[in-house]
């Protein structure tokens, strides 16, 4: 039995991954990558079998953000030529939900740019979500920025299932990425979501000039935060942002990162998120031996892979999509 399968068995028995073991994952020799992914899949299969959860993003409000996040094309300091618009109307949100439902995508993510939502924007989301739940029964995730307790309660009462607010990077590296809000601001929003009964979703961006120790620290911080769903983004450097031209990643390292997140957060939904197409490239299928969830379609301001290609990839792997009906049943079981 190789060292990664031994570690996987210890993790399944309840052991915590040490920093030394975590570093060994990130330093795994490239020629041993299949052994590492086999260990990660041993854990993934224990909790999720061969099921894959599908998610779709609706960019409900674009640009116009006062924050100074260095990776983001929508920030106040970005010069990227993106489309900017205020919160879309209810009909547009419903059209997106119908598309997700028709494509058998179980989770619909409503994402809005900005520091945090106004009460009016919360009103708009609440109004749409109530009809989305009645008509399509999708799992709804909201990602609206820094959240107040009363706003979180309104979202929960309307039927929102999950709230996303990424920590993005380690506490140590956070001020290198943005200074317009703190790491603790982000943690606080996730805690507010949890306290309101929303399922917490929080993840990371890899490739933003962090160290390997930063990657380990963010994976462990998300474990401590007990995030149910962990999106792992890989930087897609956009021209006009401070991180323009940064390209520190390669496909094999991205696989090691996904394996690390699975070993540290064994039972959680690990989602391959933004940047998978440009960073994992032809090795995208291997990522699903560690992760059990992907975004389908376009991201916020960058294009994703065609939905049909994602379905072909999953079929070729012998994996099974968690259907909308299966997702509905799992939500009913939790309620």
Curated annotation (Swiss-Prot):
Residues 47-276 form the Radical SAM core domain. It is an enzyme of class 2 (transferase). GO terms for molecular function: 2 iron, 2 sulfur cluster binding; 4 iron, 4 sulfur cluster binding; biotin synthase activity; iron ion binding. The keyword NADP does not apply. Its cofactor is [4Fe-4S] cluster; [2Fe-2S] cluster. Disulfide bonds: none annotated. Binds 1 [4Fe-4S] cluster. The cluster is coordinated with 3 cysteines and an exchangeable S-adenosyl-L-methionine. Binds 1 [2Fe-2S] cluster. The cluster is coordinated with 3 cysteines and 1 arginine. [2Fe-2S] cluster binds at residues 109, 141, 201, 271. Coiled coil: none annotated. [4Fe-4S] cluster binds at residues 65, 69, 72. GO terms for biological process: biotin biosynthetic process. It catalyses: (4R,5S)-dethiobiotin + (sulfur carrier)-SH + 2 reduced [2Fe-2S]-[ferredoxin] + 2 S-adenosyl-L-methionine = (sulfur carrier)-H + biotin + 2 5'-deoxyadenosine + 2 L-methionine + 2 oxidized [2Fe-2S]-[ferredoxin]. It comes from the Bacteria. Keywords: 2Fe-2S, 4Fe-4S, Biotin biosynthesis, Iron, Iron-sulfur, Metal-binding, S-adenosyl-L-methionine, Transferase. Belongs to the radical SAM superfamily. Biotin synthase family. Homodimer. This is Biotin synthase. It comes from Bacillus subtilis subsp. natto.
């Amino acid at each position: 039995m190789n060292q990664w399968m031994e570690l996987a068995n210890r993790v399944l028995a309840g052991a915590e991954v040490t920093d030394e073991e975590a570093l060994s994952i990130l330093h795994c020799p490239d020629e041993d990558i299949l052994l590492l992914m086999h260990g990660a899949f041993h854990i993934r299969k224990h909790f999720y079998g061969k099921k894959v959860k599908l998610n779709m993003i609706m960019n409900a409000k674009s640009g116009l953000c006062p924050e100074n996040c260095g990776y983001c094309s929508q920030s106040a300091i970005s010069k990227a030529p993106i489309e900017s618009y205020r919160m879309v109307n209810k009909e547009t949100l419903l059209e997106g939900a119908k598309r997700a439902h028709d494509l058998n995508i179980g989770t619909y993510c409503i994402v809005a740019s900005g520091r945090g939502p106004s009460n009016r924007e919360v009103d708009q989301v609440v109004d749409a979500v109530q009809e989305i739940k009645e008509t399509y029964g999708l799992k709804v995730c909201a990602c609206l920025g820094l959240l107040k307790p009363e706003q979180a309660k309104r979202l929960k009462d309307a039927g929102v299932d999950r709230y996303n607010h990424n920590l993005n990077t380690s506490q140590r590296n956070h001020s290198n990425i943005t200074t317009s809000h703190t790491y603790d601001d982000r943690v606080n929003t996730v805690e507010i979501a949890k306290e309101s009964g929303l399922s917490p979703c929080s993840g990371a961006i890899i490739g933003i000039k962090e160290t390997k120790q930063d990657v380990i620290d963010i994976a462990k911080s998300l474990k401590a935060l007990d995030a149910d769903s962990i999106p792992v983004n890989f930087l897609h450097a956009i021209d006009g942002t401070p991180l323009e031209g940064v390209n520190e990643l390669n496909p094999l390292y991205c696989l090691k990162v996904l394996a690390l997140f699975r070993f540290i957060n064994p039972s959680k939904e690990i989602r391959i998120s933004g940047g998978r197409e440009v960073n994992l490239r032809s090795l995208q299928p291997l990522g699903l031996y560690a992760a059990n969830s992907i975004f389908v379609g376009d991201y916020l301001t960058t294009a994703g892979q065609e939905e049909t290609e994602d379905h072909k990839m999953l079929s070729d792997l012998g994996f099974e999509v968690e259907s909308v009906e299966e997702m509905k049943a799992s939500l009913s079981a939790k309620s």
